[in-house]
Amino acid sequence: MAQSTLYSRVLGTGSYLPPDRVTNQELADRLAKDGIETSDEWIVARTGIRARHFAAPDVTTSDLALVAAQRAIEAADVDPQSIDLIIVATSTPDFVFPSTACLLQNKLGIKNGGAAFDVQAVCSGFAYALATADSFIRTGQHRTALVIGAEAFSRILDFKDRTTCVLFGDGAGAVVLSASEEPGILGSALHADGSYSNILCTPGNVNRGVIAGSAFLHMDGQAVFKLAVNVLEKVAVEALSKAELASEQVDWLIPHQANIRIMTSTCRKLGLPQERMIVTVDEHGNTSAASIPLALDVAVRDGRIKRGQHVLIEGVGGGFTWGASVFRF
């Protein structure tokens, strides 16, 4: 008897945004107190962002991840103790170590000894984490995975740099994957080029009890834009090829929610109508690894994404890293 193909399938999604919603005007007013000039019009014209959410000082990345995880587990209708793999994509972990995934496992009360670890690929992190979990499930090493993108990016923003501090926000998104004979994740592609590490980075590190280097995010916006629009189309086409799908078979595109101009450019290059692109950057800002699963959950819960539809996700981030996955929801 021929052995059936094993897939990893999305059973449920969840997300969380901290309650402090900050509009462009509110942020501009805060910055003006330090002599930093910006405006709602300037931010919207360049990015499409109108608001973002910031976590309170005592709220950690694992706190954000916990709520998103609980909502995804509830939507998936699974026993938390059946989750034998937790992967958290984050660039803003609670600690140097242990991993945010281990902290989350404990907060969820999961005591089964399953694997838990973090993935750090910045804004591509969720694409990396999803593909990693898919590989573990397809090979039979794990059966049920909790995959999360979570960030408290406000912790590493320099609020004296108007070119970066207006872009980012905090939040978390999660999915529960489970082994299935029914097609789920159909193809993924991951890439990196470390020679571009300096164009988007937070170059500080802990050295003998002090921060060595800068603890704030640094970005060459023009270089990032140029590289992003070049690689996103290519990695999306590669993932579709592995899935044996044409772009016209994609029901929904969920790009990393960084900049509306990058997003619309990629959508256009793929030949997809703009109406098929999920957009949350206007309300969420750039939440790094959380942006894709946040947008996914929003579109699932508002009824746009339906069972049986093909969803293409793609991200690009510091490293430089980029990745894409296509799945049947």
From Swiss-Prot:
The keyword Acyltransferase applies. It is an enzyme of class 2 (transferase). Keywords: Acyltransferase, Cytoplasm, Fatty acid biosynthesis, Fatty acid metabolism, Lipid biosynthesis, Lipid metabolism, Multifunctional enzyme, Transferase. Signal peptide: none annotated. It comes from the Bacteria. Its EC number is 2.3.1.180. Residues 257-261 are annotated as: ACP-binding. The last Arg residue of the ACP-binding site is essential for the weak association between ACP/AcpP and FabH. Homodimer. This is Beta-ketoacyl-[acyl-carrier-protein] synthase III. The lineage of its organism: Bacteria, Pseudomonadati, Pseudomonadota, Betaproteobacteria, Burkholderiales. The gene is fabH.
